[in-house]
């Protein structure tokens, strides 16, 4: 579960966790993420609150979402508990090399949300060609490309049983080095699709 931006203060964060546990009818959650960085609240205060809910047994693991490399480093420096993950936008059109390398160095996973680029994979000629060659969908190619990368986890939306089954079938796809290289070449720092007003100063 995630802590939204308006609950990053000490006390507010713990209350948010209690509310989540009550809604989920459980005593603890396996993973708690900070949804977006909030410059108005000192990160040390937020991380101390995150550690408090770990110490209380309400949360097993903590992580962040939409954090830049510098913010990841700051969060780790202020946390006794290790950070498990940084959940960020990642798909074949966005270069997230800086964050991914930082996650690997820190022993963290990088979870890719919006892994099919809000449907852009269905319009891209390179991905469509590779999908046709393998006899699968462009979405399956994008997911295979993501999970082939060390430390990357993809979280596709699954609105139907057919989508869930399709996602599982990516284990049967084997991308060649040429396939991977062609998809790698699509990545760009300018490929970001999700950039709200409160977003941080992204890594270049």
Q: Model-predicted segments: where are they?
A:
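Ser/Thr-centric signal marking residues that sit
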Residues: 1, 26, 46
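Active-site mouth loops of central-metabolism enzymes
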Residues: 1-11
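Acidic active-site catalytic centers that drive phospho-/nucleotidyl reactions
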Residues: 2, 30, 63
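Beta/alpha (TIM)-barrel catalytic core signal, keyed to glycine-rich beta->alpha loops juxtaposed to Asp/Glu
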Residues: 5, 37-204
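Short, conserved acidic/polar surface loops in the N-terminal third of protein domains
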Residues: 9-14, 43-45
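CE4/NodB-like, metal-dependent polysaccharide N-deacetylase domain
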Residues: 13-33, 52-56, 78, 108
């Amino acid at each position: 579960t995630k802590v939204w931006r308006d609950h990053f203060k000490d006390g507010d964060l713990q209350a948010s966790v209690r509310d989540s546990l009550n809604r989920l009818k459980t005593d603890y959650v396996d993973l708690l993420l900070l949804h977006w960085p909030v410059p108005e609240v000192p990160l040390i205060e937020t991380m101390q609150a995150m550690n408090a809910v770990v110490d209380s047994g309400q949360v097993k693991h903590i992580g962040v979402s939409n954090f830049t490399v510098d913010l990841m480093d700051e969060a780790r420096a202020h946390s006794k508990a290790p950070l498990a993950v940084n959940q960020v936008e990642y798909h074949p059109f966005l270069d997230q090399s800086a964050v991914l390398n930082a996650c690997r160095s820190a022993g963290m996973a990088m979870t890719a949300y919006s892994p099919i680029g809000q449907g852009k994979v269905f319009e891209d000629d390179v991905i469509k060609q590779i999908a046709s060659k393998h006899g699968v969908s462009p979405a399956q190619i994008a997911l295979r490309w993501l999970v082939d990368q060390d430390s990357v986890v993809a979280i596709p939306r699954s609105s139907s049983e057919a989508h869930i089954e399709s996602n599982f079938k990516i284990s049967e796809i084997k991308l060649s080095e040429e396939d991977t290289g062609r998809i790698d070449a699509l990545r760009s720092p300018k490929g970001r699709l999700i950039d709200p007003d409160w977003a941080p100063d992204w890594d270049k």
